[in-house]
């Protein structure tokens, strides 16, 4: 079904070419009608363009349907994209519900660069653990100032609305991933109308956005919608990506919102369709052990082979081993202290006690660690789980207690288990089973302020190079300070040039500054580019440092 839809959608592409009015580039003709964008000084924006029918009512918990409406009046594309409904950890107070259910849009940003008649295209997947976040959480002014690329930001369903699954054909799941897929089809079909080059599309994302890029690339037909992908700080191997116990969690969701009488998946889905969306999303609170842990109670699943329009029906490891995935260039990254994203929240002083949560780990390690590190559902018995918890603590902390002084080793544990080990695993699989180039880099250059300080609400701790420190040099984010150091300005420009050159490369080569990244496919050793404030260096490794 998805392949047939692709053929139908792409057949409209030629109708949309050269649709910008040369007399007024704010107006663009699309198959649905005319739109009006905004002049932002050094770039144009065309925001909140629907790519799917609203996923409400009978379309809730279903694969997205292509947008069908025709506009009789000019569509106002000057409004920023709305937030997809979510339980957002960044909202203070007890009620963290935000957003709306009707949110499936793309937003397009085009630089004013008269020296280019057309532009390569970056399709952007935002992060947020598949639970929260939004298209506008990352800025675009750095990319627009460079003037070389068109940027398209994708909004997709999140949390239970995007990823509830009973593991069978009745309520298959992965609706957020299917949204992303349909958005990529829309971009391929329509981007020429904005001066974009449909033959030069690269998909990038960070964290869950990076994992989304990888999951999209595990479909063999990805090559029909994009030329390459970059997964920053997240990939499909990460333990928080593929969920193993979605069925029980989804039936529990039903019980919480008053659908406990449902005896099968279809009955549960029909009942959930009748409930207010806000009630369903607010139920996320009931799945949290403390604070926002686990940070991803709902997420991607391996669908049943008989599921309608299944996105993936094998585990990512098995897909890669089979060789049946898109053979297009891919890059994957991690930061030296990525785990600070998850660990730093434990350093915030609690209003009730005046001390940090990290001290509570001494009494609750065996209860909390499986949720913090996402192995609760992968262990067969409680004993297996406790043994693994004990092993991790001994390996990283020895006999020391959890405290502010031992934070560095705790974040190292989080970095390894949640990010670094999975990146190494992905590279190892691709070098054995891949055919197109696969690259990797590690970033080690702490921001003055970043996610570590943001979550811990303190600056007296050295957090290192935390999750997002590299990505926010490309796409601005409020979690870090707005100013860049001189070394970060150079790195930012190198990243932007890297993306531009990667998508335009005829043979999939990738460069950063004066360094040429080395291909892992077929290599006897892991090829990893190290990026620091002092430059870049190619490393050949038996295993990651």
Curated annotation (Swiss-Prot):
Catalytic activity line of the entry: a carboxylic ester + H2O = an alcohol + a carboxylate + H(+)
Pfam hit, one: COesterase
Annotated active site: 207 (acyl-ester intermediate), 467 (charge relay system)
Subcellular localization, as worded in the UniProt entry: Secreted
GO cellular component, one term: extracellular region
Keyword set, alphabetical order: Disulfide bond, Glycoprotein, Hydrolase, Secreted, Serine esterase, Signal
Signal peptide extent: 1-19
Residue positions the entry lists as glycosylated: 113, 421, 507
InterPro entries (UniProt xref): AB_hydrolase_fold, CarbesteraseB, Carboxylesterase_B_AS, Carboxylesterase_B_CS
Disulfide-bonded cysteines: 84-103, 259-271, 515-536
Main location group: secreted
GO MF: carboxylesterase activity
Domain of life: Eukaryota
E.C. code: 3.1.1.1
UniProt similarity note: Belongs to the type-B carboxylesterase/lipase family.
This protein's name: Esterase-5C
Organism: Drosophila miranda (Fruit fly)
Organismal lineage: Eukaryota, Metazoa, Ecdysozoa, Arthropoda, Hexapoda
């Amino acid at each position: 079904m998805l392949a047939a839809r692709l053929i139908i959608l792409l057949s409209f592409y030629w109708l949309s070419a050269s649709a910008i009015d040369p007399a007024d580039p704010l107006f663009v003709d699309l198959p649905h009608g005319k739109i009006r964008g905004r002049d932002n000084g050094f770039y144009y924006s065309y925001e909140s363009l629907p790519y799917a029918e609203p996923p409400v009512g009978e379309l809730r918990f279903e694969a997205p349907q292509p947008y069908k409406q025709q506009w009789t009046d000019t569509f106002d594309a000057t409004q920023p994209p709305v937030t997809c409904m979510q339980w957002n950890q960044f909202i203070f107070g007890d009620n963290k519900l935000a957003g709306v259910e009707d949110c499936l849009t793309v937003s397009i940003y085009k630089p004013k660069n008269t020296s280019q008649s057309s532009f390569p295209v970056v399709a952007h997947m935002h992060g947020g653990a598949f639970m929260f976040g939004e298209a506008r959480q990352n800025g675009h002014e750095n990319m627009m100032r460079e003037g070389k690329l068109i940027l398209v930001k994708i909004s997709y369903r999140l949390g239970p609305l995007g990823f509830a699954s009973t593991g069978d054909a009745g309520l298959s799941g992965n609706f957020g991933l299917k949204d992303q897929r349909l958005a990529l089809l829309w971009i391929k079909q329509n981007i020429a109308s904005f001066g974009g080059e449909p033959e030069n599309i690269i998909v990038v994302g960070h964290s869950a956005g990076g994992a989304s890029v990888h999951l999209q690339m595990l479909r063999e037909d990805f090559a029909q919608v994009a030329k390459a992908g970059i997964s920053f700080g997240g990939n499909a191997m990460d333990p928080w990506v593929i969920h193993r116990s979605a069925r029980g969690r989804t039936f529990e969701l039903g019980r919480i919102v008053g659908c406990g009488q449902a005896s099968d998946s279809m009955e549960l889905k029909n009942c959930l369709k009748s409930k207010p969306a806000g009630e369903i999303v607010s139920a996320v609170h009931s799945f949290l052990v403390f604070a926002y842990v686990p940070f991803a109670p709902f997420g991607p699943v391996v669908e049943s082979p008989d599921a309608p329009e299944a996105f993936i029906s094998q585990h990512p490891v098995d897909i890669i081993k089979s060789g049946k995935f898109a053979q297009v260039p891919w890059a994957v990254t991690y930061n030296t202290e990525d785990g600070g994203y998850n660990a730093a929240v434990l350093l915030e002083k609690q209003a009730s006690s005046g001390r940090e949560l990290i001290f509570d780990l001494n009494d609750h390690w065996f209860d909390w660690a499986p949720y913090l590190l996402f192995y609760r559902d992968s262990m067969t018995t409680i004993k297996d789980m406790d043994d693994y918890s004990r092993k991790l603590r001994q390996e990283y902390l020895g006999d020391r207690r959890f405290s502010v002084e031992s934070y560095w080793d705790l974040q190292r544990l989080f970095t390894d288990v949640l990010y670094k080990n999975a990146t190494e695993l992905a590279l190892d699989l691709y070098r054995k089973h891949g055919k197109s180039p696969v690259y990797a880099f590690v970033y080690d250059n702490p921001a003055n302020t970043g996610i570590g300080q943001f979550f811990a609400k303190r600056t007296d701790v050295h957090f290192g190079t935390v999750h997002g420190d590299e990505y926010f040099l490309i796409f601005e984010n409020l979690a870090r300070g707005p100013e860049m150091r001189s070394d970060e300005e150079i790195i930012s420009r190198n990243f932007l040039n890297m993306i531009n050159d990667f998508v335009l490369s005829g043979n999939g080569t990738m460069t950063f500054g004066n360094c040429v990244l080395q291909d892992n496919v077929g290599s006897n050793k892991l090829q990893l580019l190290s990026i620091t404030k002092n430059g870049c260096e190619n490393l050949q490794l038996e295993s990651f440092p």
